[in-house]
Amino acid sequence: MTSKLEQLKQFTTVVADTGDLDAITRLKPVDATTNPSLLLKAAAIPGYADLLKQVKADAKGNVDLACDKFAVAVGSGILKVIPGRISTEVDARLSFDEPALLNKARQLIALYEAAGVAKERVLIKLASTWEGIRAAEQLEKEGIQTNLTLLFSFAQAQACADAGVFLISPFVGRIYDWYKKSTGQEYVGAEDPGVQSVTRIYNYYKANGYNTVVMGASFRNIGQIEQLAGCDRLTISPELLQQLSDDQGELPQVLKPGNAGEAKQHLNESQFRWAMNEDAMGTEKLAEGIRQFARDQEKLEKLIAEKA
């Protein structure tokens, strides 16, 4: 019997959710994703110490630019050991400023191209705010493909599909966390609200012919991953990838394109904002996620600023 990880790879593109080059080399994912929190974690790895000093020197004291250069350097290194693409995130503090998001995204792509990386191997990650979705729509028209992250609500998924974004990252574990805290209940298997959210989005996209890729993210256990086997892509931490690699049990495909989904519905800005207002979980987790990424971005800036 092959491992659950190898079985999963038969019907889902497996993505590593980490900036740890050693883990990526060992676990052999197709793609990789990073975010400000993962970059902060990577910055603590001794092997990156010289790189932090180098990007600070190259940026000539511009800490914001140094952070971008660090993200691109980490991403470029990862691309040397994976066949697919890297997702690099725009500063979360820009999440409600469409022009600033566009400028930052274009700057990241320019830095990648200066490092010899074609834009076709990069996905720009943006928070799934209304402004982030609109920025993504414009970037896609420019040939810059996007990954819409911090996606917790069905309304966000609907708006992303309408905008024609390349990929969305609906979060499973953080939805689970919210409901567990809110109700005091444990959720297992198909009863997990995070699993139900991604399943609903996947079925909606496939039923209505959307090309946007669904990449489930933010997992707390391999049970959640097993329930989403068959999803277009799943981005998984090295720890859970290792658990899947060590498990020789059977892993059947759960999500399939032929499953029934809801009828297509287009949302304008006011409808989107109202739907978000009515979704307490989605609103709280989006705001919390942006705050957390913003804090970690500030910590990374401080870390780089303090480097000799």
Curated annotation (Swiss-Prot):
Pfam families in alphabetical order: TAL_FSA
Molecular function GO labels: transaldolase activity
GO biological process, one term: pentose-phosphate shunt
Active site: 125 (schiff-base intermediate with substrate)
Catalytic activity: D-sedoheptulose 7-phosphate + D-glyceraldehyde 3-phosphate = D-erythrose 4-phosphate + beta-D-fructose 6-phosphate
Signal peptide extent: none
Gene3D superfamilies in alphabetical order: Aldolase class I
GO cellular component: cytosol
Subunit structure, as described in the record: Homodimer.
Record's function text: Transaldolase is important for the balance of metabolites in the pentose-phosphate pathway.
The protein's name: Transaldolase
Organism encoding this protein: Pseudomonas putida (strain ATCC 47054 / DSM 6125 / CFBP 8728 / NCIMB 11950 / KT2440)
